[in-house]
Curated annotation (Swiss-Prot):
One of the GO biological process terms: tRNA modification
Keywords, comma-separated and alphabetical: Oxidoreductase, tRNA processing
The protein's name in its UniProt record: tRNA uridine(34) hydroxylase
Alphabetized NCBIfam families for the sequence: PRK00142.1-4 (NF001136)
Catalytic residues (positions): C177 (cysteine persulfide intermediate)
EC number(s) per entry: 1.14.-.-
Catalyses which reaction(s): uridine(34) in tRNA + AH2 + O2 = 5-hydroxyuridine(34) in tRNA + A + H2O
Renumbered residue ranges of the record's region Disordered: 285-329
Amino acid sequence: MSQYVVCALYKFVALDDYQEIRQPLTEVLEANQIRGTLLLASEGINGTVAGKRESIDALLQWFKQDSRLADVVYKESFNEEQPFNRTKVKLKKEIVTMGVEGIDPRHVVGTYVKPNEWNALISDPDVILVDTRNDYEVDIGTFKNAVNPNTETFREFPQYVEDNLDPKKHKKVAMFCTGGIRCEKSTAYMKEQGFDEVYHLEGGILKYLEEVPEEESMWEGDCYVFDGRVAVNHQLEKSGYDVCNACRLPITDEDKASDHFEKGVSCPKCIDKHSDEQKARFREREKQVQLSNARGETHVGGDAAHLIDQRKKEKLAHKEQQRSGKKAK
């Protein structure tokens, strides 16, 4: 049996005291040797953590002590190795960032569709199926005939809706994401924009892969996950993807065989994205990682977070430039 339980969880619920919850929650995670990241905001909790079976059970039991979190939505999968390096509880404005004020899934949300009813819905020719995830996630796998909004971050989703969807034309819209949380907000947003029939996959892709037999599945490819496994197959097992530690994008064995791949420094997707100075820093970091591994330690550097933030800013700037060009025309 796999050694670690990977638990993805969330709940939209009023947590006016979310700042006070941070410390005791951190203590529970650390006391049970649970790693991963949980986000707290006034609108609820979200995140993915991993630990031994008894540790995750202890965390879920801790949630039950607070009536607001007692029925937190969670999904489990398993892995032979701990997929996280650190334990973090972060305070945020939103537990999933859309950047639109007033969207509250607790009050208005789309219609939930069970995994075993999903195939029938998305086979309806009158339904437009929209993948609410980012483009690098869609590249790895998605549902048959799903529309890719080509978003780099979830913040761009409202603009996609404004530019491409019309409540008068698109009468039935079905949406899905990894675990369900992004669809809670995206369907709430769609309802606010006047879309009447808005559906979303209850429990997300992960629940669908868990419950729908592969021979009946309309899922194509693997599913990107936000932990060290990078992606999972239909059996919810780690698939053949790795991650480039320079750009943090998923890469295949073919990518790693490329002349543009240098472990920890570059891959075909980012070879032209970083300066020589940055690459020199990445090489030094990779050297330290290898030294730490040789000592049986875990090296946690600051470059990864910096790169993720930088990549988001660059892509947002590019999107803004594209939109400005459209308006100018």
